[in-house]
Regions:
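Residue-level detector of alpha-helical recognition elements and their boundaries
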Residues: 34, 90, 113-116
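C-terminal boundary of histidine-terminating zinc-finger modules
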Residues: 81-96
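Short, well-ordered alpha-helical segments
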Residues: 51, 59, 92-99
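Conserved catalytic-core segment of NTP-binding enzymes
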Residues: 1-67, 71, 76-77
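A short, charged, Gly/Pro-tolerant segment at domain boundaries
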Residues: 100-104, 113-136
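A generic structural signal for well-ordered alpha-helical surface patches
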Residues: 55, 73, 96-99, 103
């Protein structure tokens, strides 16, 4: 039987340190197909060097990236209401990020959202408009 694992981290030192230990344990058990999800990233904090970047986290852990979920108040609100954030995929970046992760898990080749580019939200709107136009 072939096992796979997904390691979910936040870009904070304690989380990365714990994830590094988990990756080591998984590898020692023969689990080599390990994917990474970086949760609650804040691009503005990365720009000011107050948070590790996506590349920093990938380099430290040395595993393939499955997805990145930006931090958002919408996640907190949806969680408190018991609503899945993916229902907001068309109107919020975290919802789109979760949708993209699930599509990658299903084997689709999906580009990563550009969270570092100014106007990143506009690029998501552009992508969604293109998807809608293709399906009609």
């Amino acid at each position: 039987m072939r096992y796979e694992a997904i390691v979910i981290v936040t870009p904070e030192v304690p989380s990365i340190r714990d994830a590094d230990r988990v990756v080591g344990i998984l590898l020692s058990k023969g689990i080599k197909n390990i994917k990474l999800i970086i949760n609650r990233i804040r691009p503005n904090m990365v720009k000011t060097d107050d948070m590790m970047s996506i590349e920093d986290v990938k380099n430290i852990l040395g595993i393939d990236l499955l997805g990145v979920v930006p931090d958002s108040e919408k996640i907190i609100v949806a969680s408190n209401r018991g609503e899945p954030i993916v229902l907001e995929a068309k109107s919020c970046l975290p919802g789109k990020a979760f949708e993209n992760i699930s599509r990658r898990l299903n084997g689709e080749n999906v580009e990563f959202l550009d969270l570092n580019r100014p106007g990143g939200r506009n690029s998501v709107k552009r992508i969604l408009k293109n998807l809608i136009n293709r399906s009609t």
